[in-house]
Amino acid sequence: MHNMSDIIEQYIKRLFEESNEDVVEIQRANIAQRFDCVPSQLNYVIKTRFTNEHGYEIESKRGGGGYIRITKIENKDATGYINHLLQLIGPSISQQQAYYIIDGLLDKMLINEREAKMIQAVIDRETLSMDMVSRDIIRANILKRLLPVINYY
């Protein structure tokens, strides 16, 4: 059985498929009511599964008529998406942000499950056992070297 976050994620992705558009607008209260969950559950899904690293932009308006507008970033080809990711990676990157990038690569079928697990193992904090600042810098450098390889092979 999937957890509530998985169910909400699949629902939002289905909205994209059904609309044939690159933009979906949802209302927090409606989604929370539909899935009998608190609005913060929806916020969690948006913040972790529809990130820039996954290829989405989020616009949010709070209040009575508030909405969340989720836009697919228009990168129809692998090169455009890889270049987008390379621009997102600064001089350092946290393990969580790096995992979001790996999830995005998996979602776009640029890597398979096995490759994703190998990349995660290489950039994991246990593998890079050093101070956090150095670890995040090395993780960013690894990803910056790895992404072009994924693009060309």
From Swiss-Prot:
The gene is ctsR. Induction: Up-regulated by heavy metals such as Cu(2+) and Cd(2+), but Zn(2+) and Co(2+) have no effect. Forms part of an operon with mcsA, mcsB and clpC. InterPro entries: CtsR, CtsR_C, CtsR_C_sf, CtsR_N, CtsR_N_sf. This is Transcriptional regulator CtsR. Gene3D superfamilies: Transcriptional regulator CtsR, C-terminal domain (1.10.1200.150), Transcriptional regulator CtsR, winged HTH domain (3.30.56.130). Keywords: DNA-binding, Repressor, Stress response, Transcription, Transcription regulation. Interacts with McsA and McsB. It holds the Pfam family CtsR. GO terms for biological process: regulation of DNA-templated transcription; stress response to cadmium ion; stress response to copper ion. GO terms for molecular function: DNA binding. Belongs to the CtsR family. It comes from the Bacteria. The keyword Transmembrane does not apply. Negative regulator of clpC, clpB and clpP transcription by binding directly and specifically to their promoter region. Disulfide bonds: none annotated.
